[in-house]
Amino acid sequence: MPRLKVKLVKSPIGYPKDQKAALKALGLRRLQQERVLEDTPAIRGNVEKVAHLVRVEVVE
């Protein structure tokens, strides 16, 4: 199953609470922090909410 490498590249300060909650659900707390996550619909939904704050790449 493919996985997603998600990296927080922009600060969530000043953005709505739902976007901060999406980052928390992805496990991203600090700038430049990376997580490798399973590619599920729930993860994809959270990534799409904060697409302007993160960088995503598919990892096999």
Curated annotation (Swiss-Prot):
GO cellular component: cytosolic large ribosomal subunit
Domain of life: Bacteria
Biological-process GO terms, alphabetical: translation
One Pfam family matching this protein: Ribosomal_L30
Keywords of the record: Ribonucleoprotein, Ribosomal protein
NCBIfam families associated with the record: rpmD_bact
Assembly information from the UniProt record: Part of the 50S ribosomal subunit.
Protein name in the entry: Large ribosomal subunit protein uL30
Record organism: Thermus thermophilus (strain ATCC 27634 / DSM 579 / HB8)
